[in-house]
């Protein structure tokens, strides 16, 4: 299998990165061993005379011009605005082919430009090599002068958090929540299995806003700007900075700086709690002792009587069985254990969620018996 080289941007930064982030050093070595090509200059990311150039592709992703991005979004009209994030805004757009897409416009203050550029490079480098039904597809990108855009497949039902406690009026049912959890677990399993690029990938920013839903509520993981390739033959990566989102941080990672695949499992467990309770991972509108979801429910997940009190009140009682709820809560409780070695693997999560779906469906409470097959 052919694996493309990491961007020249990494080479320009490697003299600094090696001192602060051993993973970046190992990452470069691994890819250099796969390739004998030399690094191209960073300017190769930009498109010279874009208006007159034919469509180019990088690793299977289309390259677009700034003009095409403006035309696709009606000059970034507020009517096409889908949402805002830490590194810019996301717009709905329509390409010349008629395809509806989501376009992330990277828009950063000067002091954050280096971080934004890094995330842009990582996302294009990694996501354009991945292919799985539970990962959002990168259609293309634009690197025109100082402008940076990422073009994704359009996900009609937005992100998971909006359906649980956000702007979406219709709340998703328990069987659909189980299916979403299973789909997300399969996406993580693909990343962790090393089948995509030869070595495992840690997402590092798994959360409910990064679980997108298509028209049939199939889950797809998005936003790979903080993703890390694990060092070859290693299960731990020491990083200089702890990156991610508050509320989803692996406690072991924050205290030691050691990033592992199990860091994603902790975040996955937090999302399971969101699916179960309908609450946010962190809710700053609540009192100081009620803001953090994990701290609120950790000690009652294995108490069947108390567990009933935290089940999302939006869930119809006839949509779930307490047996399935109990199994689901038990899985979540093991995912959020303090010590990473005590957490289940992502494949264990996949298998248990398949069993939970089957258990819930036995009582005729929605859903179908899942097909047990290899990912």
Curated annotation (Swiss-Prot):
Recorded GO CC terms: plasma membrane
Ranges in a coiled coil: none
Keywords: ATP-binding, Cell membrane, Kinase, Membrane, Nucleotide-binding, Phosphoprotein, Plant defense, Serine/threonine-protein kinase, Transferase
Residues binding ATP: 82-90, 104
Residues that bear Phosphothreonine: 65, 245
Listed transmembrane segments: none
Sample GO molecular function, one term: protein serine kinase activity
Localisation: Cell membrane
Enzyme category, top tier: transferase
A single BP term in Gene Ontology: defense response
Catalytic activity: L-seryl-[protein] + ATP = O-phospho-L-seryl-[protein] + ADP + H(+); L-threonyl-[protein] + ATP = O-phospho-L-threonyl-[protein] + ADP + H(+)
Name used for this protein in its record: Probable serine/threonine-protein kinase PBL28
Lineage: Eukaryota, Viridiplantae, Streptophyta, Embryophyta, Tracheophyta
Gene: PBL28
């Amino acid at each position: 299998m052919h694996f493309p080289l990491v961007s020249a941007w990494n080479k320009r930064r490697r003299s600094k990165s090696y001192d602060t982030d051993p993973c970046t050093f190992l990452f470069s070595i691994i890819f250099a061993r796969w390739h004998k090509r030399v690094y191209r200059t960073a300017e190769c990311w930009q498109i010279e005379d874009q208006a007159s150039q034919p469509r180019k592709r990088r690793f299977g992703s289309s390259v677009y011009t700034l003009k095409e991005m403006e035309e696709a979004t009606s000059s970034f009209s507020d009517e096409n605005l889908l949402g805002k994030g830490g590194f810019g805004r996301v717009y709905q757009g329509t390409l010349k082919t008629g395809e509806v897409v989501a376009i992330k416009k990277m828009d950063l203050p000067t002091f954050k430009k280096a971080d934004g550029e890094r995330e842009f490079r990582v996302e294009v480098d990694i996501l354009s090599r991945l292919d799985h039904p539970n990962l959002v597809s990168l259609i293309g990108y634009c690197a025109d002068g100082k402008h940076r855009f990422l073009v994704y497949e359009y996900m009609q039902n937005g992100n998971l958090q909006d359906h649980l406690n956000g702007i979406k009026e219709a709340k998703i049912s328990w069987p659909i929540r189980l299916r979403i959890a299973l789909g997300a677990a399969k996406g993580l399993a693909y990343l962790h299995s090393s089948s995509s690029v030869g070595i495992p990938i840690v997402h590092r920013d798994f959360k409910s806003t990064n679980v997108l839903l298509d028209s049939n509520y199939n889950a797809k993981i998005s936003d790979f700007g903080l993703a890390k390739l694990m060092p070859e033959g290693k299960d731990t990566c020491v990083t200089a900075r702890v990156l991610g989102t508050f509320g989803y941080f692996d406690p072991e990672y924050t205290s030691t700086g050691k990033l592992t695949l199990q860091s994603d499992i902790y975040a996955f467990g937090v999302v399971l709690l969101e699916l179960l309770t309908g609450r946010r991972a962190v809710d700053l509108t609540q009192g100081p002792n009620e803001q953090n979801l994990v701290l609120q429910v950790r000690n009652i997940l294995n108490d069947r009587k108390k567990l009933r009190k935290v089940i999302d009140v939006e869930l119809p009682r006839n949509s779930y069985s307490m047996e399935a709820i109990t199994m689901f809560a038990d899985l979540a409780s093991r995912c959020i254990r303090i010590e990473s070695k005590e957490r289940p693997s992502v494949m264990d999560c996949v298998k248990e969620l398949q069993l939970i779906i089957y258990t819930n469906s036995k009582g005729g409470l929605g859903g179908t018996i899942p097909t047990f097959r290899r990912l």
